[in-house]
Amino acid sequence: MALRRLLLLLLLSLESLDLLPSVHGARGRAANRTLSAGGAAVGGRRAGGALARGGRELNGTARAPGIPEAGSRRGQPAAAVAAAASAAVTYETCWGYYDVSGQYDKEFECNNSESGYLYCCGTCYYRFCCKKRHEKLDQRQCTNYQSPVWVQTPSTKVVSPGPENKYDPEKDKTNFTVYITCGVIAFVIVAGVFAKVSYDKAHRPPREMNIHRALADILRQQGPIPIAHCERETISAIDTSPKENTPVRSSSKNHYTPVRTAKQTPEKPRMNNILTSATEPYDLSFSRSFQNLAHLPPSYESAVKTNPSKYSSLKRLTDKEADEYYMRRRHLPDLAARGTLPLNVIQMSQQKPLPRERPRRPIRAMSQDRVLSPDRGLPDEFSMPYDRILSDEQLLSTERLHSQDPLLSPERTAFPEQSLSRAISHTDVFVSTPVLDRYRMSKMHSHPSASNNSYATLGQSQTAAKRHAFASRRHNTVEQLHYIPGHHTCYTASKTEVTV
């Protein structure tokens, strides 16, 4: 009996020696598993839970509450320990993890011993309890125990404006952009305007010649002038210059030129004015017209007495027009376009026309002073060849206009010296024009005493052609002059003055 007891004690001692290393090995393995798989937090939680519970195993397997620890088994028989181990029920705990949506699932225990779901099965992102031991999940291989990177939201950190982030107007370049854009637009607009103006000026029709104010007044007073008459007046009013071969108007008022006549007289040369009454036998009425003009008021005289230098530009303008007029062949449409001259073609025929009839001498009643006045000496007999009497066509022909032969008119040697000196003394009137000639003619017809020179009617037939051309030129003579106050009738002191 004593021998059996000794053998049993030896076995129990050997068995207790074998259990102690196994318990220490299990604890070391559990610590290594928690450090490698769950990290410091999960491992600490596992270790703390295992230490707090004290009755569970470190690998997640529960121990029966009635089974004491290995240290308490010392001194117990081996059969009792084996029976207690077989009767104990173990279960697993599923650790906490982050699922596929980034949500954290807490750990849970598979301790449903009645149904047998004691093991943690499934995948790392979806875990559940099962009762098949070979399907349980090795949780140490899973890595979803920490929050994923894509779930972590960036922290909204407010950056305070430092000295480098402050607004500096000198570094702002937006104003320069606006200025440059506006400048380019303005430059394009100005360039377009200048281009438009230049294009209009380049394609503008040529302007008409600016007529001098004095020339415009003269043309306005003359009215519509035939072309032949205009040529006649222009050619008779200008002289050819030997130096520049340009027409130059004679500026001398008293231009004495000897005239070739059929009968040469040794007396003094007569005055040859520019188609004025000096070539007409009406000097008495000429002097009376100046007598009327002598009574003009001071205001009118000051208006008439103008500076001749003002007409220098008019003189040059007339010379230029005359030069261009005879140099251009197609001048008729140009003159007609200006509306100043009608289109009357110059007749260039060289045929001799039929002899013209001399106009009948007007019959005038002699006044009392004419009858009582002493007889005036008649001039010498005037003889003029018939071929020297020119017609209108010959007078207005191109050869006659360009010729240097002066127009012939009968000499007047018995004119009243008083009338001639009085006419010449009036220097405020420059040159007698056809307007004044017609004005003298009207005065002569109204005053028979002006025709006391018997020779005055003899030269009327020779100058009828010239006076006929000048008579149709002026439609208004005295009416176009300035208003002359005062009475203009020349009294003859005759009570029996009758005009037929």
Curated annotation (Swiss-Prot):
Tissue expression pattern: Expressed in the developing ventral mesencephalon.
Span of the signal peptide: 1-25
Membrane-traversing stretches: 175-195
Segments for region (Disordered): 52-73, 240-269, 349-378, 444-470
Residues carrying covalently attached carbohydrate according to the record: N32, N59
Comp. bias intervals (Polar residues): 240-255, 448-464
Residues carrying Phosphothreonine: T433, T477
Subcellular compartments: Membrane; Postsynaptic density
GO molecular function, one term: ionotropic glutamate receptor binding
Claim: Transmembrane helix is one of the keywords in the record: yes
Ranges facing Cytoplasmic side: 196-500
Positions in the Extracellular compartment: 26-174
The keyword Nucleus belongs to this UniProt entry's keyword annotation: no
Residue ranges annotated as motif PDZ-binding: 497-500
Membrane topology: Single-pass type I membrane protein
Positions where Phosphoserine occurs in the chain: S391, S397, S409
PANTHER family reported for this sequence: PROTEIN SHISA-6, PROTEIN SHISA-9-RELATED
Subunit description: Component of the postsynaptic hippocampal AMPA-type glutamate receptor (AMPAR) complex, at least composed of pore forming AMPAR subunits GRIA1, GRIA2 and GRIA3 and AMPAR auxiliary proteins SHISA6 and SHISA7. Interacts (via PDZ-binding motif) with DLG4/PSD-95 (via PDZ domain); the interaction is direct.
Functional summary from the UniProt entry: Involved in maintenance of high-frequency synaptic transmission at hippocampal CA3-CA1 synapses. Regulates AMPA-type glutamate receptor (AMPAR) immobilization at postsynaptic density keeping the channels in an activated state in the presence of glutamate and preventing synaptic depression. May play a role in self-renewal and differentiation of spermatogonial stem cells by inhibiting canonical Wnt signaling pathway.
Domain notes: The PDZ-binding motif interacts with PDZ-domain of scaffolding protein DLG4.
Family in the record: Belongs to the shisa family.
Protein name: Protein shisa-6
UniProt organism field: Homo sapiens (Human)
